[in-house]
């Protein structure tokens, strides 16, 4: 970890990504099983390096394989053709394990069987022409590179950059920085991943009250790259306007952006990230460039049991928030019809915000 002075003159801290001693032991264990893990394209291997690394005290949340699979499943359900098209490009803007890239590679490897029959040519094409990623630190970069490319030493790994896009996201310069690093303006059809959630401001004590949300910046910058599909997992507190550091204007824009096609919402973050508390829960969503319509909203509770679902606009009844309790929607609509002034953005969000 390290401290630095931000553009606003305040001291800020970036915590360690890992507990050093635990991480070193884990890496040794990883190299013992490296050969076993190298072939992620064939067979049903469910392990990866993060099975050997305990949860870390950091704002870098590593995505479990099960969650990665659910997100890529959503992509495949909604747009199966992208995994059969050898021109489709994918990027993870904040790769922390390589799981998104390898899961996509697996789907492409199957989907392109007819287009590129030779397996060696197929994987070379996928890794060189279709998959891209940015890893935020040297240690993560080497780990992702080893996981994604180690089984294919003949494949060029230049599509994976050692690049932390946090500052670029804060400055609204992600597109420009990517163009500089790749040597040309890039076009990505699909952006997927788990962006950083917050940046600690102040001293190194890790005072959570000083934490400023930054995930919304990655969502905005991803949209500016104009992909056909955007799939990310983020905290859910924006839905009820109960998060610090996210402008009201950003929340308004997202609530009224009818290109968000699907949201899976988990009020208990442990259902996605075991042992990690994220107040208000987490959600993953699918945004589609050419979609304009209602959002299919799914609420998961009780260890991922699907309890509620609804198809409607995010800004239901112009409430200014996402009504996470689907059963309340009909009641709210009845109240709105009787007394339209009763529900205002400020008072209503205060009434139904989750208790943290």
Q: Residues of each region from the PLM?
A:
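SAM-dependent methyltransferase catalytic region
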Residues: 1-262, 268-272, 281, 288-294
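C-terminal substrate-recognition regions of SAM-dependent nucleic acid methyltransferases
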Residues: 58, 269-356
